[in-house]
Amino acid sequence: MAEMDLVAELPPPEGAARWAEVMARFAARLGAQGRRVVLVTSGGTKVPLEARAVRFLDNFSSGRRGAASAEVFLAAGYGVLFLYRARSAFPYAHRFPPQTWLSALRPSGPAQSGKLSLEAEENALPGFAAALQSYQEAAAAGTFLAVEFTTLADYLHLLQAAALALNPLGSSAMFYLAAAVSDFYIPVSEMPEHKIHSSGGPLQITMKMVPKMLSPLVKDWAPKAFIVSFKLETDPAIIINRARNALEVYRHQVVVANLLESIQSSVVIVTKDSETKLLLSEDEIAKGMVIEEKIVEDLRSRHTAFICDKH
């Protein structure tokens, strides 16, 4: 299978075996509690153009959807394994850009016993106290685990390890595949070893297609799980057909289809026999509601029905 060959070809990230053990323990502990667990993938991958990489082809994604969704899943009682691009949006923290902290926080007094106390006006970081409390509660309960990736190779190895960790949970596991994964890569055997120099003239690169990892995920790594993929398009005339084609090819449960122009306010939940449009009203937007709240609410209901159908 081309997908498995690619995972074997690409070098694993440093600490891959350790992370596989950590994820397996996380899933087993929450599974023993009877808790559902969701893997949320978030952010974009990048592929190196040289073996000693200086240049990369990067799939940009802020990771905001994955981070916001992770928060809603935690609030709904799920354990969340958050596989995210380093330095992309992080649950709770993404609402507060670092530059706002510099003007909002100030020392409240001299440091004592190695501790620094900070204070801020309540309106300087609106919502910060509640976000901090939610994050710390999840950390204390052991229901949140964050694992970083950077390159395509990192992502594929860690995705496989995460899937194998969640596989024993059967239908109680959900995969929420919101990461923007590279479509092209250069095989290791075809990479130049050193930095590509501009003195050589215009650059021509031949890249191979990255096989879709939905196939081994559905068939081999976690065949009993509830699997959700995402489809982003710019043409409304083709988006539903492309979502349905993905369901037919990979045989998973749900595609969340969204158009670039309305990505933060509207999606369509597509299954093999239904289409459900989720839309934020102007009032909901004014109140600060995010579309991920509606997405997760819908998927949680579908996941419940999926579990009941399997038992």
Language model features by range: what are they?
Residues 1-311:
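A cross-family phosphate/adenosyl-ligand binding-site feature
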